[in-house]
UniProtKB/Swiss-Prot annotation:
This is Cellular tumor antigen p53. Disulfide bonds: none annotated. Residues 283-295 have a biased composition (Basic and acidic residues). Residues 319-360 are annotated as: Interaction with HIPK2. The modification Phosphoserine is found at S9, S15, S20, S33, S37, S46, S183, S269, S315, S392. Its main location: cytoplasm. Residues 300-393 are annotated as: Interaction with CARM1. A motif ([KR]-[STA]-K motif) lies at residues 370-372.
Length: 393
């Protein structure tokens, strides 16, 4: 059905008037009116005007039209919700644990360290008894590489840090958040790496995509003329006591010798402690290590520990019975010596009697000691008789 055409002579309803006609309906000086609320009220349509729209007769060819609905007002944007606090960063867990077992391989790979004492002024010192390196933060730590025969060309040396304790060995060793934000980068090392190589522009810092572990790799260089070993200078860029990092957990540094394809040629490791006073900490730990070794001495071969009686562990142990029941005859020259030794003997007998009373706590045992003391008195008389004879050798 075709829609009837509108007659141009018919005036359109109010809702379709032009903007100029609507502007004329506004009260004068509405913009500069001191009462803006009253001017806004004048703009509001009265109920009579609305009723007039509905009762107005439309033209012959035009149906009454309803006023167009006002466009929907977009809802006011909600106030931005406060951002939730970022969760604490969780350290990534490694899917594999590198081996720390010493493996010299066919080239006799091993490590060496410079000899240094335990003075407070040292910045790096190694303890052979503990196989542990004590060093300060970001200080030079020379590590010597020894081989019996030269490895093939393209050999590399990799250094990696892992936690020593089994409950933390799967965690990746990295710097604490505070030291990560420090501006001490040399342009090559990522800020989260703990181990760096000093004075080597060929160092490569690796982040394994599978294990997430950090390592630094340098090409192996043969010893210089007149030297028997190759020295690499490492730096440790975080303290062992830093919260959020190692957090006082002991770590190991694993040094591996690899060929150009990554095949293992040798492996060695040592423990590391990064602290403020390496000499003092080394001296303290070595003393504790020696004390622990002295408190648990090794038993000789074939020795058997004798089990203690389960009766009274707190009471003093009695002497061996064969020694208590044996009697000896002693020939003494001179009465003065005899009286002195007799008093000593009586004092010892009295001491044994008092010890027996404390352990047993019975009169029967004390009477036995008195009878034993009487026997010793008769023995003294016998000794006195012998002293009257000729002197003996």
């Amino acid at each position: 059905m075709e829609e009837p055409q509108s007659d141009p002579s018919v005036e359109p309803p109010l809702s379709q008037e032009t903007f100029s006609d609507l502007w004329k309906l506004l009260p004068e000086n509405n913009v500069l009116s001191p009462l803006p609320s009253q001017a806004m009220d004048d703009l509001m349509l009265s109920p009579d005007d609305i009723e007039q729209w509905f009762t107005e007769d439309p033209g012959p060819d035009e149906a009454p039209r309803m006023p167009e609905a006002a466009p929907p007002v977009a809802p006011a944007p909600a106030a931005p919700t406060p951002a939730a606090p970022a969760p604490a960063p969780s350290w990534p867990l490694s899917s594999s644990v590198p081996s720390q077992k010493t493996y010299q391989g066919s080239y006799g790979f091993r490590l060496g360290f410079l000899h240094s004492g335990t003075a407070k002024s040292v910045t790096c010192t190694y303890s052979p008894d503990l196989n542990k390196l004590f060093c300060q933060l970001a200080k030079t730590c020379p590590v010597q590489l020894w081989v019996d025969s030269a490895p093939p060309p393209g050999t590399r040396v990799r250094a990696m840090a892992i936690y020593k304790q089994s409950q933390y060995v799967t965690e990746v060793v990295r710097r604490c958040p505070h030291h990560e934000r420090c501006s001490d980068s040399d342009g090559l090392a990522p800020p989260q790496h703990l181990i760096r190589v000093e004075g080597n522009l060929h160092a490569e810092y690796s982040d394994d995509r599978n294990t997430f572990r950090h390592s630094v790799v340098v090409p192996y260089e043969p010893p210089e003329v007149g030297s028997d070993c190759t020295t690499i200078h490492y730096n440790y860029m975080c303290n062992s006591s830093c919260m959020g990092g190692m957090n006082r957990r002991p770590i190991l540094t694993i040094i591996t010798l690899e060929d150009s394809s990554g095949k293992l040629l040798g492996r060695n490791s040592f423990e590391v402690r990064i602290c403020a006073c390496p000499g003092r900490d080394r001296r303290t730990e070595e003393e504790n290590f020696r004390k622990k070794g002295e408190s648990c001495p090794k038993l000789p071969t074939g020795s058997i520990k004798r089990a203690l009686p389960t009766g009274s562990s707190s009471s003093p142990q009695p002497k061996k019975k064969p020694l208590d029941e044996e009697y000896f005859t002693l020939q003494i020259r001179g009465r003065e010596r005899f009286e002195m030794l007799r008093e000593i003997n009586e004092a010892l007998e009295l001491k044994d009697a008092m010890a027996g009373k404390e352990s047993a706590g019975s009169r029967a045992h004390s009477s036995h000691l008195k009878s034993k003391k009487g026997q010793s008195t008769s023995r003294h008389r016998k000794l006195m008789f012998k002293t009257e004879g000729p002197d003996s050798d």
